[in-house]
Amino acid sequence: MKAPDVGDVVWLMFDPQAGHEQSGHRPALVMSPAAYNHKTGLMVCCPMTSQIKGYPFEVITQVDGVDCAVLSDQVKSLDWRVRRAKKKATVSKEVMLHVQAKLKALLSLP
């Protein structure tokens, strides 16, 4: 697989996990650009879930016709090669902007 890119939805294994972190084989929204991901073998991403709970940092979207939430408060840096990330979809620019806005608020970025 070529390096994942910003806005890609990839499926990968989140285990091992600890505490309240998402676990198992699940989708994630890629937040870092392909150039970084290719060079480092890492990617910055937010896990996704079909269990929508209405939390303030969820961003609702659809992937393959399934409603799901991007968990923008659980941002991670993961080795996409070792975790065998597979691209399944791409989100809209609007969804990316919404997730980026949530991350800015969470991290108190200007």
Give the positions of each predicted feature.
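Conserved functional hotspots at enzyme active or ligand-binding sites that engage polyanionic ligands
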Residues: 1-110
